[in-house]
Amino acid sequence: MTASIKIQPDIDSLKQLQQQNDDSSINMYPVYAYLPSLDLTPHVAYLKLAQLNNPDRKESFLLESAKTNNELDRYSFIGISPRKTIKTGPTEGIETDPLEILEKEMSTFKVAENVPGLPKLSGGAIGYISYDCVRYFEPKTRRPLKDVLRLPEAYLMLCDTIIAFDNVFQRFQIIHNINTNETSLEEGYQAAAQIITDIVSKLTDDSSPIPYPEQPPIKLNQTFESNVGKEGYENHVSTLKKHIKKGDIIQGVPSQRVARPTSLHPFNIYRHLRTVNPSPYLFYIDCLDFQIIGASPELLCKSDSKNRVITHPIAGTVKRGATTEEDDALADQLRGSLKDRAEHVMLVDLARNDINRICDPLTTSVDKLLTIQKFSHVQHLVSQVSGVLRPEKTRFDAFRSIFPAGTVSGAPKVRAMELIAELEGERRGVYAGAVGHWSYDGKTMDNCIALRTMVYKDGIAYLQAGGGIVYDSDEYDEYVETMNKMMANHSTIVQAEELWADIVGSA
């Protein structure tokens, strides 16, 4: 171990901590070391560790966050070499609630709580839960659906080693969890010190160039194809409007997906996306056979160490202004829109119902209502609903209750999802599902809605978007809205292709 690397806590402190713990089931002891960033960014650190050009690489992820409303999430996270990957769904021969598997797996880990200086994620499960998993949470929504993308319904990496980048102190924190069910504390400490030292060596190695992904020549001007087309989507809108007028639902959220061939490496799509569409939830998840690339604006649900559950309904959108005055005027216009306010309040009520199902009703609160949140290109109406879990409920129960968001399904939620399944006839996959993490601490989680998210598989980027349909929605306008939502990501691909064509040439 190099002299400049200090592992914390030291072994004597860790032994003392182990002796002080009354709970004999505690078996995870996190240790860590700091590394000044030295101008090393999280995405370059990820490239050094993930080795994307290596065909024998393991799954990995990069989670980042961009500043919104002058608030910056403190940490970015990198994960490599998971101890185990949970994959479920028909493609894996496991058609069951993935949260049951995850909860059982994570029940075998119990982290020592009094290790100071750790970020909100210091080890745990990271990945996605697809929209289609709702059939396990709400069996009434189950329908026979065509599986176009052939992806796992859930994909979760269990990572004992996490590299966190602290945006405040501009330093990396390399964390490894010692599992005393698998080794003694002393042996585990030495192994952890070696793992941390090896990671530091890779991050500080300037003897070789940064291993950017290999990028072949770019084929320009490729086109996309929708799975339903203009006529098909407008028919979806018309059908849902009939159900709304009959009183079956108040709102429904149909979607369409486009397939766009591209010769870009998926990480080069992500690099451009994080620049042109900075968002609270930026992620690149390498599942080896496919990749998930996203810039989501919207929290689905999170929980903290005090069992407080939070969800953020977002509904109502207006563009950013060219000047501060125009920006504020547009925000006032959005606040004053009766249609946007009515739809938003409906989703807040839905969120309150979801929270009430698993939280003490006396703790359920609308913490923020109809506030404006500003993003890079748009402004949204945002609210916050929270509550404290009842003693018999867990974070997994909270996730099931809130999933999927009303903004991607409708209201009443179950009936809307039944109608959506019958109309779309295909699995949605990652779109409208959740991307995020579940900590080993047994309490915390943080999951965003998989919006503005792309799936890259076999040289094709899949983009998907939907829109909320109410009784007076216009079919053509709704079709255009979904296309506009997808075009933000499509433009990212086009711009990245043009940039890389200048560097590596065109095919």
From Swiss-Prot:
* UniProt feature coiled coil, ranges: none
Which EC number(s) does the record attach to this protein? 4.1.3.27
How is this protein annotated for GO cellular component?
A: anthranilate synthase complex; cytoplasm
**MF GO annotations:** anthranilate synthase activity; metal ion binding
Quote the catalytic activity from the record: chorismate + L-glutamine = anthranilate + pyruvate + L-glutamate + H(+)
Quick one: which residues bind chorismate? 316-317, 431, 452, 466-468
| Keyword Metal-binding attached | yes
- In terms of domain of life, where is this protein from? Eukaryota
- Which cofactor is essential here? Mg(2+)
**Cofactor binding description:** Binds 1 Mg(2+) ion per subunit.
Which residues are modified to Phosphoserine? Answer: 81
Name the positions where Mg(2+) binds. Answer: 343, 481
Q: Phosphothreonine: which positions carry it?
A: 223
Binding-site positions, L-tryptophan = 65, 280-282
One annotated GO biological process: glutamine metabolic process
Q: State which pathway it belongs to.
A: Amino-acid biosynthesis; L-tryptophan biosynthesis; L-tryptophan from chorismate: step 1/5
Query: What keywords does the record list, in alphabetical order?
Result: Amino-acid biosynthesis, Aromatic amino acid biosynthesis, Lyase, Magnesium, Metal-binding, Phosphoprotein, Tryptophan biosynthesis
Note one Pfam family from the annotation: Anth_synt_I_N
NCBIfam families, per the entry:
trpE_most
Subunit structure and binding partners: Tetramer of two components I and two components II.
Misc remark: Component I catalyzes the formation of anthranilate using ammonia rather than glutamine, whereas component II provides glutamine amidotransferase activity. Present with 6510 molecules/cell in log phase SD medium.
**Which family would the database say this protein is a member of?**
Belongs to the anthranilate synthase component I family.
PANTHER family according to UniProt: AMINOBENZOATE/ANTHRANILATE SYNTHASE, ANTHRANILATE SYNTHASE COMPONENT 1
- Its name, as the record gives it, is Anthranilate synthase component 1
Species name for this entry?
Saccharomyces cerevisiae (strain ATCC 204508 / S288c)
Q: What is the lineage of its organism?
A: Eukaryota, Fungi, Dikarya, Ascomycota, Saccharomycotina
